[in-house]
Amino acid sequence: MAAMVDSKPAASVQGTPLLATATLPVFTRGIYSTKRITLETSSPSSPPPPKPLIIVTPAEKGTFNVILFLHGTSLSNKSYSKIFDHIASHGFIVVAPQLYTSIPPPSATNELNSAAEVAEWLPQGLQQNLPENTEANVSLVAVMGHSRGGQTAFALSLRYGFGAVIGLDPVAGTSKTTGLDPSILSFDSFDFSIPVTVIGTGLGGVARCITACAPEGANHEEFFNRCKNSSRAHFVATDYGHMDILDDNPSDVKSWALSKYFCKNGNESRDPMRRCVSGIVVAFLKDFFDGDAEDFRQILKDPSFAPIKLDSVEYIDASSMLTTTHVKV
């Protein structure tokens, strides 16, 4: 059976600014209350999901675009609850499968095939599990992934007609020479032209244990540079690490341990990082899905509107091949 949890917008405190400096609405919680729905493969829905799912959706009446989210290496999909809630509160339905739970993870090919099964389930299976009067626009779906899930998101975009792809510190292996299979970074250019946003981290390439969690040669820069046919944006969260988009204390013990001790983390609160990532995702999709470009273009023009420091912000418009670069000192 599906389980639902309600979440309502937090009440604001009059006269107390949420941020120390000016910001944009996308970096704060949106206008919609949200519902979190959990679905197991044993669900009586027809067809049942091929993998356990978390769905976070606006609770109000409306038609909303869909984001398929793919979790990071051996992490629980429950570990991203703050980001899911923020994005859904701005009018998106987030569908997050638990592709696997094992350490070490399965082969990247098996992970890709599992993600493909969920993508194929969406048109037939998603709508019947949503609240009454909440409609999913499955004709316009974005795929988004973190870490190794970012690699899977890009690989899936080479196979299916998604509306956009988003990589959150995507990783394609432990080094340039030990990539995952399928090795999509072996391509000089990805064979798609859909809009792309890639958000990297400044500390992802810094080793804490044996190796860095997002090593140079297999990280966000490599993915961005291969999107040669797409309108594409690139952001780097300078002072944050690979796991800093997760909840503060993931409920899953394994995810908690990986989050705290496996990767180099930033020294500041994770909340501004999560709000920054969520806000960029919302602004990007509002631009390319809804035609509302104001917030996204404002972030590109002046990254200081973000709640954290962003370096080397770059945007390339495929229609004109013009490049806008903003290096924040």
From Swiss-Prot:
Organism: Citrus unshiu (Satsuma mandarin)
Cellular location(s): Plastid, Chloroplast
EC identifiers of the protein: 3.1.1.14
Active site: S147 (nucleophile), D169 (charge relay system), H242 (charge relay system)
GO molecular function: chlorophyllase activity
Gene Ontology cellular component annotations, sorted alphabetically: chloroplast
Function per UniProt: Catalyzes the hydrolysis of ester bond in chlorophyll to yield chlorophyllide and phytol.
Keywords annotated in UniProt: Chlorophyll catabolism, Chloroplast, Hydrolase, Plastid, Transit peptide
Protein name: Chlorophyllase-1, chloroplastic
Presequence range in chain numbering: 1-21
Pfam families with a match to the protein in the record: Chlorophyllase
Family, per entry: Belongs to the AB hydrolase superfamily. Lipase family.
Disulfide-linked positions: none
Main EC class the enzyme belongs to: hydrolase
Known pathway: Porphyrin-containing compound metabolism; chlorophyll degradation
Gene3D superfamilies in UniProt: alpha/beta hydrolase
Reaction(s) catalysed by this chain's protein: a chlorophyll + H2O = a chlorophyllide + phytol + H(+)
Record motif GXSXG, residues: 145-149
BP GO annotations: chlorophyll catabolic process
